[in-house]
């Protein structure tokens, strides 16, 4: 397990940490900064903050949360949700984020990946992919926290995202998310085999044995 990074993902709505199943039925869990510090104390290697409604309402509201966390937590922080421009990315990086994750805006304008990578480096750009299994055994790219269909194939999009300059991929299985029934290993293997950048598996983790 020496090469495995344990990354705590915190989904945010307004000022609250929330949790759901399949990105639906979201309920308030507590204060995101308190949970971030707890995960840090427990040995998390990184943190990911995702604003679950930012793309829907066209805004990013995580600046203050990120500032507070960055003052108390000394591991890399990735922030996503509602990032639509280089300026949006810069604002979050200035607040203390180490990386920004983009999803919805990148599917509409893939050159945003390149623009942010040129300005801050590929190591700062995470392509967030929300994947939903289809009837033909493939996976479709979803956006807006799993609300909207794109018709895009996940594996193809991951390859294109790398070409545009993404330094990592955050791969969330909507079908497994929140279930604690294990990762979609087939999905993770398919994407990982087609790109040379790190792939972060998200959705379904329930016990430590799943890292083996």
Swiss-Prot record:
GO MF annotations in UniProt: imidazoleglycerol-phosphate synthase activity; lyase activity
GO cellular component: cytoplasm
Active-site residues (renumbered): 11, 130
Tree of life domain: Bacteria
Catalytic activity: 5-[(5-phospho-1-deoxy-D-ribulos-1-ylimino)methylamino]-1-(5-phospho-beta-D-ribosyl)imidazole-4-carboxamide + L-glutamine = D-erythro-1-(imidazol-4-yl)glycerol 3-phosphate + 5-amino-1-(5-phospho-beta-D-ribosyl)imidazole-4-carboxamide + L-glutamate + H(+)
Top-level enzyme category: lyase
InterPro entries in the cross-refs: Aldolase_TIM (IPR013785), His_biosynth (IPR006062), HisF (IPR004651), IGPS_HisA/HisF (IPR050064), RibuloseP-bd_barrel (IPR011060)
Associated pathway: Amino-acid biosynthesis; L-histidine biosynthesis; L-histidine from 5-phospho-alpha-D-ribose 1-diphosphate: step 5/9
Quaternary assembly: Heterodimer of HisH and HisF.
Family under the similarity heading: Belongs to the HisA/HisF family.
Listed name of the protein: Imidazole glycerol phosphate synthase subunit HisF
